[in-house]
A protein has these predicted regions:
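Conserved Rossmann-like nucleotide-cofactor binding loop
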Residues: 130-131
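Peripheral, non-AAA+ core regions of ATP-driven protein-machinery
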Residues: 3-14, 18-83, 90-98, 103-114, ...
């Protein structure tokens, strides 16, 4: 008797669109060559009771009868993180924290767990990438830890769900979502269907049991969280932890927040004993700035509700090639090309035979249009070899 063919479907890696056959372009997000083939998950009776435990009879409620007086935010005791979250953690929220491997995501969340446990909160840290011994070693490096932090090294989401319902913690950390799986979903951990199923279950746990869940997600080479784009749509808040691998500064940026602004940014410094908050980023950004040096300008950018001073560096030199080079770090490349074209058109600065290198010192990435004036002055300063007064601050579009 011939074996029955295993049924498969195709998922879009970007948005999670499902199709019975392979498509060159996704009808949902219009991405090309984004479909992957995965087996269809079979329904298994009597799966984890967590979903049913969080499922309650839905009853329509008048909006006027809904009260929010008891929805107090929980402070992480990390002021820079509270700033990005909009004032603290919202109970029952689902937060996605993305970033490059080794950037410090786990360190940041482990420090948050320590602060929450010191305030009497029950915390469950679920790790699918490290052993108990490794987590203990990292915790000892960060300092004194409370005994109230529970650690679970597991990747089976059904076991994790049961542990959450038994313990009923205030905050859960999932590190990372790409390692979680369910046995009844017939695909490898990190696949589109596994990530989508895991996020769906965690969302129901967060909303049904009023437990705040932090999800750690790795990013792709394009700088977005690996997995289906629907992952970012399902969560309440999306935070990106960024930074230059060669610099000590780290930046926590919100790209989605249902409970606050997405314009805020948190600044940290990576040290041997963990992350340290930078309450005055301008002071740190201008450390080591050379005085009376051509091509170096202090510019001002508004990040959220506070101004930040940064050093804009430019190097303009004669090119040895037919096509001059244009590079930028920390700011938009196309914006730099636009400004160079405006300078050539309006003030007659001919850079057709010159290479131009633009850099925002400190590893910070700024898309603020007010940085335009700093870029223009830095390029002029380098081209004319004239230093700008170190006490001069420029900003303007």
């Amino acid at each position: 008797m011939a074996k029955s063919k295993k049924k498969t479907v195709f998922f879009c890696k970007q948005c999670g669109y499902e199709s019975s056959k392979w498509l060159g372009q996704c009808p949902g997000c219009h991405e090309w060559d984004s479909f992957v083939e995965e087996p269809v998950a079979k329904a298994v009776p009597g799966v984890s009771g967590t979903v049913s435990a969080t499922k309650k009879d839905a009853v329509p409620t008048l909006l006027s009868n809904v009260t929010t007086d008891d929805e107090n935010r929980i402070s992480t005791k990390i002021s820079e993180m509270d700033r990005v979250l909009g004032g603290g953690i919202v109970v029952g929220s689902l937060v996605l924290v993305g970033g490059d491997p080794g950037i410090g995501k786990s360190t940041l969340l482990l420090q948050m767990c320590r602060n929450l446990s010191d305030e009497g909160k029950k915390v469950l840290y679920v790790s699918g990438e490290e052993s108990l011994r490794q987590i203990k070693m990292r915790a000892e490096r960060l300092g004194t830890f409370s005994r109230d932090i529970s650690i679970l090294c597991e990747t089976d989401l059904d076991i994790i769900s049961n542990s959450i319902t038994d313990m009923m913690p205030d905050v859960v950390i999932i590190d990372s979502i790409q390692t979680m799986y369910r046995e009844d979903v017939g695909s490898a951990p990190g696949s589109v269907s596994q990530v989508r199923e895991a996020t769906s279950i965690l969302m129901r746990i967060a909303k049904g049991l009023h437990i705040t869940v932090f999800i750690v997600g790795h990013v792709t080479k394009e700088g977005v969280v690996a997995g289906p784009r629907v992952l970012e749509h399902m969560v309440d808040t999306v935070l990106y932890f960024e930074g230059d691998g060669g610099a000590s500064f780290r930046f926590l940026r919100g790209v989605k927040n249902r409970f606050g602004s997405t314009n805020e940014i948190g600044v940290f410094e990576m040290r041997a004993d963990g992350l340290r908050e930078v309450l005055n980023p301008s002071e740190y950004m201008l450390q080591g700035k050379p005085e009376n040096e051509a091509g170096s300008v202090v510019a001002c950018s508004i990040e959220g509700t506070r101004p930040i001073l940064v050093e804009v560096q430019a190097l303009v030199c004669r090119t040895n090639f037919n096509m001059p080079r244009r590079t930028s770090a920390g700011t938009d490349y196309n914006r730099v090309n636009l400004l160079l074209a405006v300078m050539e058109k309006r003030i007659g600065l001919h850079l057709g035979d010159c290479d131009a290198y633009i850099n925002v010192a400190g590893g910070m990435r700024i898309n603020e249009p007010a940085l335009d004036m700093g870029i223009v002055l830095a390029v002029l300063s380098s081209y004319k070899n004239i230093a700008i007064d170190s006490k001069t601050i420029c900003f303007g579009e």
